[in-house]
Amino acid sequence: MITAAPRELRQLPLYHDIDIRGPETEVATIFENIYQPWGREQFVRATAPVIRFDDVPEEWRGKAGGIEIVHLGPVDQECDPGLVKAFPDALIGLTPQGFMREWPNNGKVQAIEWLGARELLPRVSALVLSAEDLPKSPRGQEMLQEFIELCPIVAYTQGPRGCTIFHGGQATRVPAYPAQEIDPTGAGDVFATAYLLHLRKTGDPIEAACFANAAAACNIEKPGATGVPTLSEVEARLRLTPLD
């Protein structure tokens, strides 16, 4: 993992077996999520520095680095798009929400145009984004269509309605799996990670979406990071009948 975060966060037991690189900082990026009947309100309370190409360890770069999968996951404009150049042979996954938001009024997050999409997306293997990442105006759907034209695989997540996979000129709806929701925070991150892992394993964008939907369903049934499921939990969820 490459991140910009304080030492105390890197030393949490949750990360004891993860190789964490990147600059140690005084503050971490902090969000506050408030879930309302009409959707999520989000606020930025603190921001960490930008992560740049030079923060990638030299031994991880290029063909010699042997990195097979990269998940570029900006949350608040903190990832330099040039990071993808360090991994020329990897499957590159992108969750772009951090490129598509600003927080001008008291830290309240709002959707904006992603001006760098046309340059970055042709270098990306799979794009994962949610309905919440896009503007609610008609421009939101226009942006989605532009992304579909620029990236070979787009996974558009829609919460309890599952997701739609855009690939090869086709749109395939993949239903969600049953779940008793306790905490939806982080479900998108779990979906994206599971999707990229299974896409790398199978090469099948639709099969990967089924796997990722099952992982996300498991995740929302527990609070916080405790909800990250095991492989056996995901496989058990896959044996259930998806929601129609």
Question: Where are the predicted features?
Answer:
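Conserved N-terminal subdomain of the carbohydrate kinase-like
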Residues: 1-73, 77-78, 83-93, 236-244
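A structural micro-motif
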Residues: 18, 67, 90-91, 124, ...
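Short, acidic/turn-prone active-site loops that include or flank metal/cofactor-
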Residues: 25-26, 96-100, 177-180
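Short, charged, surface-exposed secondary-structure boundary motifs
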Residues: 29-34, 101-107, 181-185
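A polyampholytic, Gly/Pro-enriched intrinsically disordered region
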Residues: 40-49, 111-123, 174
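A short, aliphatic-rich alpha-helical micro-motif
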Residues: 64-65, 121-122, 148
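Conserved beta-alpha-beta core of the PfkB/ribokinase-like small-molecule kinase fold
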Residues: 69-144, 161-162
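Conserved phosphate-binding/catalytic region of the ribokinase-like
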Residues: 140-244
